[in-house]
């Protein structure tokens, strides 16, 4: 497999939930560092880029060996779309980089338990299936297949079917929830449609524990404890 993949980590300075979360220490490393190191540890990835508007995030990222894409202010607001951020990064790469990359691996910095091995397996799935899009997911404890939707008249109907809420879980299709950890896609395909591919989408399944997403101080504390236990059990 050739190194035609580039990793993109999107990390703006502002955050509504946990302030400055991308640079908060987690087990001795800034939160974003876990994602940078995971990307660097995957042999299929040629270079690791961080798109940010924030000076501190940029300096930490460069110190860890990542390359920085300076994101304009208008793409760092609460209303800025991830699509526009990715398109900006692709345009930047095409202008600044000599090497042409076929695939992009988008990694959110708030998924510290996603490892190099996960990224490697997701890329291998992308290649093996000739997928247009691979997205990391987990199977939630309570399947949404058994959920209801509210109708305009106040009644409720089964989300999947009217029978699904009353069926055994094992008789229903598996349902997945995206965890935001890994998105693998073709750069040319993304540019063509200005969005993630909608067909030939394959799931890369991770455990619910590995899918931890840092949004609150409690999330950070839980992952800190998990990392301590993991280190003890080495």
Predicted features and spans:
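Conserved core of the sugar-phosphate nucleotidyltransferase
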Residues: 84, 112-200
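Hydrophobic helical membrane-anchoring modules
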Residues: 203-205, 209-234
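A short, N-terminal amphipathic alpha-helix
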Residues: 31-47
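Short phosphate-binding loop-to-helix
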Residues: 55-103, 114-117, 121
């Amino acid at each position: 497999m050739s190194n035609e993949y580039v990793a993109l980590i999107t990390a703006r300075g502002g955050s509504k939930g946990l302030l400055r979360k991308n640079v908060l220490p987690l087990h001795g490393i800034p939160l974003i560092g876990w994602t940078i190191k995971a990307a660097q540890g995957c042999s299929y990835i040629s270079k690791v880029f961080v798109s940010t508007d924030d000076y501190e995030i940029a300096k930490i990222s460069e110190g860890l060996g990542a390359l920085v894409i300076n994101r304009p202010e208008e793409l760092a607001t609460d209303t800025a779309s991830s699509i526009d951020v990715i398109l900006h990064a692709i345009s930047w790469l095409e202008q600044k980089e000599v090497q042409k990359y076929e695939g992009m691996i988008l990694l959110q910095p708030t998924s510290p338990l996603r490892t190099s091995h996960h990224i490697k397996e997701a890329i291998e799935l992308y290649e093996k299936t000739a997928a247009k899009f691979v997205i990391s997911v987990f199977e939630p404890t309570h399947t949404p297949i058994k959920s209801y939707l509210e109708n305009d008249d106040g009644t409720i109907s089964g989300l999947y079917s009217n029978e699904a809420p009353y069926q055994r879980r094992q008789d229903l299709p598996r349902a997945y929830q995206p965890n935001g950890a890994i998105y693998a896609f073709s750069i040319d395909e993304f540019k063509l449609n200005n969005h993630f591919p909608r067909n030939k989408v394959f799931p890369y399944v991770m455990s619910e524990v590995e899918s931890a997403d840092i949004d609150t101080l409690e999330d950070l504390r839980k992952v800190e404890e998990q990392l301590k236990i993991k280190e003890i059990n080495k």
